[in-house]
């Protein structure tokens, strides 16, 4: 009875899989980005945050920007490398700095990323405790012992590795007679004392290592409660303790209470037959959804958050299929699924490399062109030249040659073209939804088209008997009349009768130009009219000139692309050479914003105001926002997923939820301003590599990589005083949105911005102790207070060490002493010589006196 109740509760939790109306933005990484091979079979993440990918040729480490590859017999590795290139599985040890690698024919490898060394575990016929065979298919950590791993092999059953001793215990038909087969695809330690084993052609077994008991389940023809297929490729245990299996014949759920299986192969909503194909990987994500990877049928997603009962035949699914657009997989065969520590999803495909799905919604998404005619998620033309939103929330996109594309959400539901008789021209340059919900379209060489929202029909309107007019703007005034600006002036239409009320041009009015680009009426009833080549004009309702603004008067540009009035009654004018704001419509004083004020580009194409009063505008370098509360600009470019290339003039619309749409030469860029401007905590910068640069004169590359895994202190010799540092953030979803500043404290105590490549280079740094500091922030956010640091000590050469300097001082003192001693001795000798000389002179003088005395006495006596 308890088993029956448990089964009912289990099914209750399983029920009501909901279809999630969410599209996934998929980024692709492959051999072009440095991946060793596009056949990716397993993914894991180490304790330092780096991702590891096992492929059909080599092991790959990914730091967020660059791949480091590991091959068999790699000459770049100074120690023993990986034993094989053809891999099956990678697993990051949660207790140790080790990546475990299962190879197809070359045993088990353990890579210590702190020591950067490989340890190989291979079959040794002379050692009974070695790995029994080298064909390793899967790795599962032991839940009973921290020092244990369970290994499945293709030919010789299950192995248990005692990591401390390095010895293997063998579980196969020789040691466990109840095992149906030694060929295994996968093994899972369920944490309940049982191992769950997926066999090659022999179904699914539950094995108790303690008592060596085995239960085996296989497909039984005609039994819908049996295992759907006898090849079991993957097994997982979800958060509720349920066992899910991926087989060669679909997905199965093990009902432990009744010892049978729930199959999903008869699900009527499985339009791609994913759940009855070969299931190669199953992963439960943190949001309680199951992601199921299949061969040739992409990915199916089941939501486990349930509230009512549905049978397996009725559950709904979400799919990610192969396709050419950014919402599809690069290959229909998905081999593995992994969720990283930032909740991002990584998918390994068979031939399509890596597919990445961010946990965060993209700042900007693009409705882009696809050459595939029946692709409902894309435009039929590259250039979006006009935009408007109808009352049902559908976006009407006028294109430059493809007519009108209508989108509901991200799905194209209609195309209206000249060839189908709906519109007179496929080149749509202007559009408007009027106050009654009807749509107006202006075209190049096609005049005006009117779409009646009630009867869902188009009507062409001839202006002055001409149908080939170049219409650039359409506006509805406060009297609900329709103003049409074209290359011959302005036409005002009565929308009820479709008759022309008035036609204005430079000949019959005070208009300064016939080339009209934008029309807006302010709160005083005046009309602000922007032209191509003759600046801005302000007019009365009957187009009497009030004031004009041109370059001759100091206005920044004569080309006006769009004019809007915001909630504060300010007028914003997008020109070819700056953004102009009239703070008041009374005094007509204005301020011009240009590059010196923070604009990334001054060719302002289209303008919109969000719900918070911020002013958004497209330009030729991306999209910018004037943040009213901060009086500053936020700039977004291609690195933020804004389409590359120029944007279209006056091509903008908004939906009722506040989403803004800008048209460009590469599709429609849409975004939620609240999400785009949401404050994000600064990600921590990670120093990923330090490279000692070889001498520039050498033809060979003598650069040397320094291992930074052991700590944040590096000691270099005097000959290693030229080096480069590479850094990144480990959340790949932020990689293109992050900017960096750095400082080498001790050399220069100033912060410098990093321009590109996430790296800096220092050359000929003098001996000393330095601290390298690096900060990261998301574009337009604040810099953090804390920085990632690396202490670098450049040791002096032998002749500049402290003891060498001490010897130099001692020798110098000795030399000085000897010089002084010699000098003193010289002085003493000179003094003695002078004294002797003086004495000698005195003696000579005395002798001379004596001689004179004797001579004088002698003469006297004579």
Regions found by a protein language model. Give the residues of each.
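Residue-level detector of Asp-centered blade-edge/turn motifs that repeat once per structural unit
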Residues: 45-48, 92-96, 141-146, 189-192, ...
């Amino acid at each position: 009875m308890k088993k029956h109740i448990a089964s009912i509760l289990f099914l209750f939790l399983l029920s009501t899989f909901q279809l999630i109306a969410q599209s996934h933005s998929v980024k692709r990484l492959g051999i072009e980005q440095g991946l060793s091979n596009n056949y990716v079979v397993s993914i894991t993440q180490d304790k330092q945050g780096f991702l590891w990918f096992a492929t059909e040729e080599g092991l790959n480490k990914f730091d967020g920007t660059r791949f480091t590859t590991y091959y068999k017999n790699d000459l770049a590795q100074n120690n023993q490398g990986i034993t094989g290139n053809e891999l099956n599985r990678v697993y990051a040890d949660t207790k140790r700095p080790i990546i475990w690698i299962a190879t197809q024919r070359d045993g088990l490898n353990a890579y210590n990323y702190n020591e950067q060394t490989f340890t190989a575990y291979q079959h040794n016929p002379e050692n009974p405790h070695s790995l029994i065979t080298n064909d390793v298919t899967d790795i599962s950590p032991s839940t009973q012992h921290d020092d244990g791993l369970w290994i499945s092999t293709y030919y010789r059953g299950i192995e248990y590795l005692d990591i401390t001793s390095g010895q293997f215990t063998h579980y196969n038909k020789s040691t466990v007679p109840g095992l149906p087969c030694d060929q295994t695809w996968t093994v899972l330690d369920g944490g309940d004392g049982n191992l769950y084993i997926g066999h090659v052609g022999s179904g699914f077994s539950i094995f108790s290592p303690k008592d060596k008991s085995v239960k085996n389940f296989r497909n039984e023809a005609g039994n819908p409660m049996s295992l759907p297929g006898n090849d079991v490729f993957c097994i997982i245990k979800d958060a509720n303790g349920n066992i899910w299996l991926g087989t060669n014949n679909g997905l199965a759920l093990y009902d432990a209470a009744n010892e049978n299986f729930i199959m999903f192969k008869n699900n009527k909503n499985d339009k791609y037959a994913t759940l009855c194909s070969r299931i190669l990987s199953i992963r439960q994500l943190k949001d309680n959804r199951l992601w199921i990877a299949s061969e040739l049928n992409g990915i199916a997603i089941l939501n486990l958050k349930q509230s009512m009962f549905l049978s397996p035949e009725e559950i709904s699914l979400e799919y990610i299929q192969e396709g050419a657009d950014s919402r599809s997989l690069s290959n229909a065969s998905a081999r593995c699924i992994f969720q990283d520590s930032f909740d991002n999803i990584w998918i390994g495909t068979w031939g399509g490399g890596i597919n990445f799905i961010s946990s965060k919604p993209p700042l900007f998404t693009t409705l882009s062109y696809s050459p595939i005619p029946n692709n409902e998620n894309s435009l039929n033309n590259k250039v979006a030249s006009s935009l408007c939103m109808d009352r049902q929330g559908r976006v009407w996109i006028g294109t430059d040659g493809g007519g009108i594309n209508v989108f509901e959400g991200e799905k194209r539901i209609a195309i209206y073209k000249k060839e189908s008789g709906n519109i007179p021209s496929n080149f749509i340059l202007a559009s408007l939804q009027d106050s009654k919900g009807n749509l107006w379209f202006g075209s190049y060489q096609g005049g005006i088209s009117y779409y009646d929202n009630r009867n869902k029909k188009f009507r062409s309107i001839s202006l002055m008997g001409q149908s080939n007019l170049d219409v650039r703007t359409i506006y509805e005034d406060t009297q609900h009349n329709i103003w049409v600006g074209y290359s011959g002036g302005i036409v005002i239409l009565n929308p009820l009768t479709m008759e022309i009320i008035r036609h204005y041009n430079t000949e019959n009015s005070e208009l300064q130009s016939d080339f009209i680009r934008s029309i807006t009426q302010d709160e005083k009833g005046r009309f602000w009219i922007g032209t191509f080549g003759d600046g801005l004009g302000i007019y009365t309702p009957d187009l009497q000139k009030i004031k004009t603004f041109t370059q001759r008067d100091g206005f920044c540009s004569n080309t006006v692309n769009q004019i809007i009035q915001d909630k504060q009654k300010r007028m914003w004018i997008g020109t070819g050479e700056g953004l102009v704001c009239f703070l008041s419509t009374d005094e007509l004083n204005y301020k011009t914003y240009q590059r010196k004020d923070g604009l990334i580009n001054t060719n302002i194409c289209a303008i919109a105001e969000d719900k918070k009063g911020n002013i958004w505008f497209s330009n030729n370098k991306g999209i910018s926002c004037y943040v009213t509360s901060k009086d500053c600009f936020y700039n977004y470019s291609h690195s933020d997923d804004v389409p590359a290339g120029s944007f279209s003039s006056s091509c903008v619309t908004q939906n009722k939820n506040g989403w803004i749409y800008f048209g460009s030469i590469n599709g429609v860029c849409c975004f939620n301003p609240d999400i785009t401007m949401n404050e994000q905590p600064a990600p921590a910068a990670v120093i990923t590599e330090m490279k000692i640069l070889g001498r520039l004169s050498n033809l060979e590359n003598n650069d040397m990589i320094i291992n930074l895994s052991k700590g944040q202190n590096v000691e270099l010799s005097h000959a290693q005083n030229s080096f480069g540092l590479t850094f990144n953030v480990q959340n790949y979803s932020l990689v293109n949105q992050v900017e960096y500043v750095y400082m080498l404290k001790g050399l220069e105590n100033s912060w410098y911005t990093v321009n590109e490549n996430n790296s800096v280079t220092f050359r000929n740094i003098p001996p000393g102790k330095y601290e390298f500091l690096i900060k990261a922030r998301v574009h337009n956010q604040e810099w953090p207070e804390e920085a990632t640091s690396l202490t670098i000590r450049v040791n002096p050469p032998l002749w500049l060490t402290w003891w060498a300097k001490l010897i130099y001082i001692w020798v110098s003192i000795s030399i000085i002493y000897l010089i002084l001693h010699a000098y003193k001795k010289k002085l003493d000798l000179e003094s003695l010589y002078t004294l002797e000389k003086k004495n000698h002179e005195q003696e000579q003088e005395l002798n001379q006196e004596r001689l004179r005395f004797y001579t004088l006495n002698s003469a006297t006596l004579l």
